[in-house]
Structures are given as C-alpha cells and as structure tokens.
Amino acid sequence: MSRLALFDLDNTLLTGDSEVLWVEFLMARGQLDCSLAERNADLDQRYHAGTATPAEFCEFFASTFAGSSADEWAPWREAFMHDVIRPRLPAAAFALVRQHREAGDVLVRTTASSRFLVELTAREFGFGHLIATELATDASGRFTGRTSGTLNMRDGKVTRLHDWLAERGEPVAPALAAATFYSDSINDLPLMLAVGRPVAVDPDPRLALEASARQWPVLNLDRLRSNNNNNNNNKT
C-alpha cells in the first residue's frame, strides 16, 4: 500500500467549521430557529478548547438534518457548498493536497463532521477516501437527527481509521507508522500521536503547545488567497 496522507477538514483545509457554518447558513435562510445560535456558538467555542464531548458535538449537528432525506437536503447542500464553503477553501490547501497526490500517496479525508455535509468538499479536493461521522436514517430514508456508529472524533478517529484499514486488508501498524496527518485541533491529538508524521496546521493554542513540546512540524496556510477559480486545475 502507498503511504497514507490523512487530512482533517475544518479549520485545516477549510477556513472555518463546516457544521457551525451550516447552522448559520440554515438560520439565515429561515430553515432553523435562530434560538440555536447560542448553542451553536457555545459548541464551537468548546470544541476549539477541547472541552466539548464527541457525543454532544456530533449529535447537535446531526439534529439539524432531522425529518428530511438526503434528496430533500441536496439543494440546500449544493447552495451551502457554492455560497459558503467554496470561498473558504484556500488555494494553499489545494496545493498541499496536490503535493501528496503527485507523490503517489493515498489521500484520506477524516473529519468529525457528517459524511453527508462534507462529501462535496471531499470531491472538490479530489479525495478518493472519506472517513466521517455517519447520520442515522429511518426506514423511509429520512435522517433521524441522530448519528450512527462510532463518532469520528478524538479517539474515534483512531478507531475508525483502524476499521478502514482492516476493511482494506492493510496491516495497521506499518500503515500508521508511514502516515502523515494534518490537523489544526487538540481534538485530533489521539490520531496525531498514532501516526509517524503529524503536522499541525494553523494549530489552536493547545495543539500549538503540543507541537512545540513534541517538535512536530507546524504549517501555516495562506488563507488570504481563496480558490474561487476552476478548482479542477488543483486536481491534476
């Protein structure tokens, strides 16, 4: 197997948090009650501080999809991608991913955000693999507002990556030893400790301290340059 290049999404390749931005997007368009603004901001702050639990963080954002199917949410997701997400994707992020693609690495996006919300962003970057939090559905295919399976956050990111490697028949230890993982967040410390080459990207204060103490590389992306042109040019 080629080397793994693992990438977090929110505040790493994306400037901002996709699920926090999703709630703001829906509230601005009257699709969610604006009373959720305080809860949204509180979870965002506590996530960055590393004090929000995976369950409360992931379940809150899963609740925003409750009662509708993927097909019903699709137009909203497309508008969100166009209006909010794409302008927040720095050209430097595409260049970083392209560097690993050209090196022949296996590109994996691993994120605490829900698969449904972020799969368009993964496609935008040309990721072949996506590990994300899964949304539960009922018998009719509508989202229940709950999550399903292991949450892809903190220790769950390590568990889900182990499962993904096992499904592919790949030995876990050598794959992780050769892997690079990019993240901004202290919440990703378990996976950063598990790989051979952790890289802190515009790290939050707690991760910056860890990176300094452990002499990990620190990367500062040029976030002033968005990628509003033809993103296909970044996938070659």
Over which residues does each language-model region extend?
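Hydrophobic alpha-helical segments typical of transmembrane helices
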Residues: 22, 60-61, 117, 160
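C-terminal cap/substrate-recognition subdomain and adjoining C-terminal extension
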Residues: 2-4, 75, 82-236
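A general alpha-helix detector
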Residues: 21-22, 42-43, 56-60, 76-80
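N-terminal alpha-helical segment
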Residues: 36-40, 57, 175
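Acidic/polar active-site rim loop that often engages polyanionic ligands
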Residues: 19-22, 58, 140-146
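Short, compositionally biased "basic patch" segments
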Residues: 44-70, 134-139
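Conserved active-site and cofactor/substrate-binding residues in soluble primary-metabolism enzymes
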Residues: 17, 68, 156
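Active-site neighborhood of HAD-like aspartate-dependent phosphohydrolases
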Residues: 1-52
